[in-house]
Swiss-Prot record:
It catalyses: oxaloacetate + ATP = phosphoenolpyruvate + ADP + CO2. It comes from Bacillus cytotoxicus (strain DSM 22905 / CIP 110041 / 391-98 / NVH 391-98). Mn(2+) binds at residues 198, 217, 254. Its EC number is 4.1.1.49. This is Phosphoenolpyruvate carboxykinase (ATP). It is an enzyme of class 4 (lyase). InterPro entries: PEP_carboxykinase_ATP (IPR001272), PEP_carboxykinase_C (IPR013035), PEP_carboxykinase_N (IPR008210), PEPCK_ATP_CS (IPR015994). GO terms for cellular component: cytosol. Binds 1 Mn(2+) ion per subunit.
Length: 528
C-alpha cells in the first residue's frame, strides 16, 4: 500500500458521515455520558476506566521498518521493527472496522508550542473520552490555524479492535505502530489513553533532533527574572512537587524541546498522577480537575460522585488530564529562553548519593545517559526491596534514536548556554531504605532554591571520593552535616561499601553505551 493509498483511505474515513470533527469540550462530555463511556464527578470532570490495560504496553510498540528510517532508528526491545506489509494489512483492517462505527471523533491540533517547530497532528478516535483526552492534552488550534492545518501526523485509535498475533505479527491483541513515512500511528487493543500522548512524544523524539532540537522528558518553569529551569527525573523522584513553585511559572510538566531559540513545551496540557492526591499536598493539580478534565482509573463514589484518590483498586497509575491553562501560574504560549539551571532528580534508596551536587558537562552527560533512580517495594509486582533502575535520558521507552545523540546535544547546549547542572537526591539519608529516612522535603526545596538563585555558583565544594561529584559545604537553611551523606551514617565502613556497590551498578549499566566519548566515562562517571 503506497503512501497515496494510505492517505486516500484516511480521507474517506475523515469524510464519512460518522466522523465528528473538532467537537467542543461540552459536546464531547455529552457524548461520553450518552455513550456510557464514563461518569461525571462532583467537580465536573469525566471519569473513565481503561479496562485491563492500566498503563503503557512497551512490548506492543513497533516502528515500521521503512527505507527512510531503517538506518536511523536504534532497533531493539524498545524500538521493535515491523514490516511495511504487516502494517499495511493491519491498517486496512482497522480502517474497515472504524468505517462501520456509528460515530468517530476527530481532533486536529499541534505538538510543539514554538510555531517554528510545531507538528500538525490529528487524532481519529473510536471513543469520545479519548478524543476529550487528546483535546485537553495537545495544543488546541485557533480557527485560523485550523484552516491552515496541513500534512498532519495522524493517530488512528481503535481500542476495541484486537489484533491476532499469528496473523498480524504483533505480540498480543494490543498494538502501537508508528509509520514515519506514512505519518500514521496505529493503536488498537488497548484503552489506555497515555499511549496516544507517548506516541506523539516518541515521534517528536525522532523529528526534533533532525532539526537540531533536543527533545526532553522533563518539567520546566521560569522565574520572575526570566531564568529557566529544567527538572529531569523518573517516577517518584519529586519532579512534579519540586517544579510547582509559587514564585515560578510553569512552562510544562512533562515534555519539552530545546532549540536555538530556547525551551518550548511539546504539549498543551498535563497528565498528572493522582495517587493520594490532596488539596493540601498539590493544590494546583487538585484544583485543575474540573469540567472538561479527564480522570483515568480513579475510583468514584456511585452516589456522591466524589473521587477517592487513595483507592488503588484498579491501579496505582491513576491519572488526570487537563489543559495547561487550568493552572493559574503558567506561561502562555508555553515558550521561554535557554535554561540557566538543570536539575536531575534521583530517589536513591541506597542512601549514598549526596542530597545535592554540582555536575561538570561530562558528569551531566553521564548522569543523563544513566537516568538513575530506585524502584521501591509496591510500585511494581515482584519488587519487595528497592532496586536500582536506569532509564536512559530519563525516558528510555520513548527514544527512537541512539541515546548518545541526545546526550551529545545536551552537552553541546550546556556548554553553549553555560547552564548549571545539579544532581539532587530526594531519596534516603542516614542509611539505606529500611535503616535511614527519606530526605526532608523542606531541605530539598531549600537546596533547589539555592541552585535556582545562583547561591551555589561560588560556594566551596568538596569532591565525593567515590562518585567524583562536587558537593557544596554549605547551603542556606540546610544543616551542613546533611550535605555529606557519609556523616549521616552511623557506620562509615557500611556507607563506603554501599557507595562502591552503587558505583559498580552505574559502571555495569554504562557498558551498553559502547559508542560514547571516553571523556564521558573518564570524567563523568564514578572515580572509585
Amino acid at each position: 500500500m503506497s503512501t497515496v493509498n494510505v492517505q486516500i483511505g484516511l480521507h474517506e474515513l475523515l469524510n464519512g458521515s460518522n466522523a465528528q470533527i473538532q467537537l467542543s469540550v461540552p459536546q464531547l462530555v455529552e457524548k461520553v455520558l450518552m455513550r456510557n463511556e464514563g461518569k461525571l464527578t462532583s467537580t465536573g470532570a469525566v471519569s473513565a476506566s481503561t479496562g485491563k490495560y492500566t498503563g503503557r504496553s512497551p512490548k506492543d510498540k513497533f516502528i515500521v521498518k521503512e527505507p527512510s528510517v531503517a538506518n536511523k532508528i536504534a532497533w531493539g526491545p524498545v524500538n521493535q521493527p515491523i514490516s511495511e506489509e504487516r502494517f499495511n494489512k493491519l491498517y486496512t483492517k482497522v480502517l474497515e472496522y472504524l468505517k462501520e462505527k456509528e460515530e468517530l471523533f476527530v481532533f486536529k491540533g499541534f505538538a510543539g508550542a514554538d510555531r517554528n517547530y510545531r507538528l500538525p497532528i490529528q487524532v481519529v478516535n473510536e471513543y469520545a473520552w479519548h478524543n476529550l483526552f487528546v483535546h485537553q492534552l495537545f495544543i488546541r488550534p485557533t480557527e485560523e490555524e485550523l484552516a491552515n492545518h496541513n500534512a498532519p501526523f495522524t493517530i488512528v485509535s481503535a481500542p476495541n479492535f484486537k489484533a491476532d498475533p499469528a496473523v498480524d505479527g504483533t505480540n498480543s491483541e494490543a498494538f502501537i505502530i508508528v509509520s514515519f513515512e506514512k505519518r500514521i500511528v496505529l493503536i488498537g487493543g488497548t484503552e489506555y489513553a497515555g499511549e496516544m500522548k507517548k506516541s506523539i512524544f516518541s515521534i517528536m523524539n525522532f523529528l526534533l533532533p533532525e532539526q537540531d532540537i533536543l527533545s526532553m522528558h522533563c518539567s520546566a518553569n521560569v522565574g520572575e527574572e526570566g531564568d529557566v529551569a529544567l527538572f529531569f527525573g523518573l517516577s517518584g523522584t519529586g519532579k512534579t512537587t519540586l517544579s510547582a513553585d509559587p514564585h515560578r511559572k510553569l512552562i510544562g510538566d512533562d515534555e519539552h524541546g530545546w532549540s536555538d531559540n530556547g525551551v518550548f513545551n511539546i504539549e498543551g496540557g498535563c497528565y498528572a498522577k493522582c495517587i493520594n492526591l490532596s488539596h493540601e499536598k498539590e493544590p494546583q493539580i487538585f484544583d485543575a480537575i474540573k469540567f472538561g478534565s479527564v480522570l483515568e482509573n480513579v475510583i468514584v463514589d456511585d452516589k456522591t460522585r466524589i473521587a477517592d484518590y487513595s483507592d488503588t483498586a484498579l491501579t496505582e497509575n491513576t491519572r488526570a488530564a487537563y489543559p495547561i491553562d487550568a493552572i493559574d501560574n503558567i506561561v502562555l504560549p508555553s515558550v521561554a529562553g535557554h535554561p540557566n539551571t538543570i536539575i536531575f532528580l534521583t530517589a536513591d534508596a541506597s542512601g549514598v548519593l549526596p542530597p545535592i551536587s554540582k555536575l561538570s558537562k561530562e558528569q551531566a552527560m553521564y548522569h543523563f545517559l544513566s537516568g538513575y533512580t530506585s524502584k521501591l517495594a509496591g510500585t511494581e509486582r515482584g519488587v519487595t526491596s528497592p532496586q536500582a533502575t536506569f532509564s536512559t535520558c530519563f525516558g528510555s521507552p520513548f527514544l527512537p534514536l541512539d541515546a548518545s545523540r541526545y546526550a551529545e546535544m545536551l552537552g553541546e547546549k550546556i556548554e553553549k548556554h553555560d547552564a548549571k547542572v545539579f544532581l539532587v537526591n530526594t531519596g534516603w539519608t542516614g542509611g539505606e531504605y529500611g535503616v535511614g529516612k527519606r530526605m526532608n522535603l523542606a531541605y530539598t526545596r531549600a537546596m533547589v532554591q539555592a541552585a535556582l538563585n545562583g547561591e551555589l555558583d561560588k560556594v566551596e565544594t568538596v569532591k565525593h571520593d567515590i562518585f567524583g561529584l562536587d558537593v557544596p559545604l554549605h547551603v542556606p537553611s540546610v544543616p551542613d552535616e546533611v550535605l555529606m551523606p557519609e556523616q549521616t551514617w552511623a557506620d562509615q565502613a557500611a556507607y563506603k561499601q554501599k557507595a562502591i556497590e552503587l558505583a559498580n551498578q552505574f559502571k555495569e549499566n554504562f557498558k551498553k553505551f559502547d559508542n560514547v566519548s571516553k571523556d564521558i566515562i573518564n570524567l563523568g562517571g564514578p572515580t572509585a
